[in-house]
C-alpha cells in the first residue's frame, strides 16, 4: 500500500454550488424540471462550438405546447440537423412506453451565433416599429405622472405594466420572423424498423443503416460540417473542475 499512497491525492470538490437548488443551475430550470430537458442543456454546454450530439427524446419534447419555450431556448443555441422518428417497440422491452425520436443537434459556431443574434435583433426591431407610437405614448405618460406633485402610484404602475406587456408581446411576435431570417432546412425521417422488436430481439429489416447512408450524402451535399480529425478529451482536476481539450486548447466547462 505504501507505494500507492504516494500517488493518491485528496480531491477537493467545488463548493460554489453547495446549497443551491439543482434547477437554479440550469437556464431551462425555471421553465421545466423534466430530466430529459435538463440533460439536453447539460450536453449542449459540454459541446464545443460547432460540436454535434445525438439524443433519444420523447416525441412530446418536440411537439407538446407547454414545452414551446424549451424548444425556443435550444433553437437559439444550436441547429437541429436531423429528426428521426423510431418505432415505440424499440424501448418497450426496457419498460419504456413513450414514443421516441432520435434528435441530432449542432451547437452554433461563433459565426452562427452572430447570424442568429442578427436575425433576432432585426426581427424585434422590425416588429417594434409597428408599436413605436404606443411605446412612446406610454413612456411619456409614465414621465408625466412621475413629474406631478401628487403622484398617483396606481396610474404609474398600470402604465409601467402595460409597457412591460407590450415589450413581451413584441418579443413573442418577433419569434416567427427570427426563424424566417435565420432559416435552414431540418431533415425529418421516419423508420418503421430500427433493428429491435418489442421483445428486445434483433429484427431483420433494420432501416437505420440505409438512413445513415442517405443522410451522409445529404450532409456532404449541404456542407453541414467538415470532417475533423482532432481529438477531444475531458479531464477533472484535483479541485473537481472540468476541462475540455480540443485542438490543443484547454477550456474550463462551467455552469
Question: Where on the chain are the PLM-derived regions?
Answer:
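A conserved structural/catalytic subdomain of Rossmann-like adenosyl-cofactor enzymes
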Residues: 1-255
Amino acid at each position: 500500500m505504501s507505494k500507492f499512497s504516494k500517488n493518491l491525492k485528496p480531491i477537493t470538490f467545488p463548493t460554489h454550488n453547495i446549497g443551491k437548488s439543482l434547477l437554479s443551475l440550469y437556464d431551462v430550470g425555471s421553465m421545466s424540471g423534466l430530466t430529459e430537458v435538463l440533460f439536453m442543456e447539460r450536453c449542449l454546454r459540454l459541446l464545443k462550438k460547432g460540436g454535434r450530439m445525438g439524443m433519444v427524446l420523447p416525441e412530446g419534447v418536440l411537439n407538446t405546447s407547454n414545452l414551446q419555450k424549451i424548444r425556443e431556448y435550444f433553437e437559439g443555441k444550436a441547429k437541429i440537423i436531423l429528426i428521426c422518428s423510431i418505432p415505440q417497440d424499440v424501448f418497450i422491452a426496457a419498460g419504456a412506453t413513450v414514443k421516441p425520436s432520435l434528435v441530432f443537434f449542432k451547437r452554433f459556431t461563433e459565426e452562427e451565433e452572430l447570424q442568429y443574434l442578427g436575425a433576432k435583433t432585426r426581427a424585434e426591431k422590425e416588429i417594434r416599429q409597428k408599436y413605436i407610437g404606443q411605446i412612446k405614448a406610454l413612456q411619456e405618460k409614465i414621465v408625466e405622472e412621475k413629474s406631478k406633485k401628487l403622484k398617483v402610484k396606481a396610474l404609474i404602475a398600470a402604465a409601467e405594466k402595460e409597457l412591460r406587456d407590450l415589450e413581451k408581446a413584441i418579443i413573442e411576435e418577433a419569434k416567427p420572423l427570427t426563424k424566417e431570417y435565420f432559416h435552414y432546412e431540418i431533415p425529418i425521417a421516419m423508420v418503421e424498423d430500427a433493428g429491435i422488436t418489442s421483445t428486445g430481439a434483433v429484427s431483420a429489416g433494420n432501416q437505420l443503416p440505409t438512413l445513415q447512408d442517405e443522410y451522409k450524402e445529404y450532409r456532404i451535399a449541404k456542407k453541414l460540417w467538415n470532417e475533423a480529425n482532432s481529438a477531444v478529451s475531458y479531464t477533472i482536476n484535483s479541485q473537481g473542475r472540468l476541462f475540455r481539450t480540443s485542438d490543443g486548447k484547454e477550456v474550463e466547462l462551467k455552469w
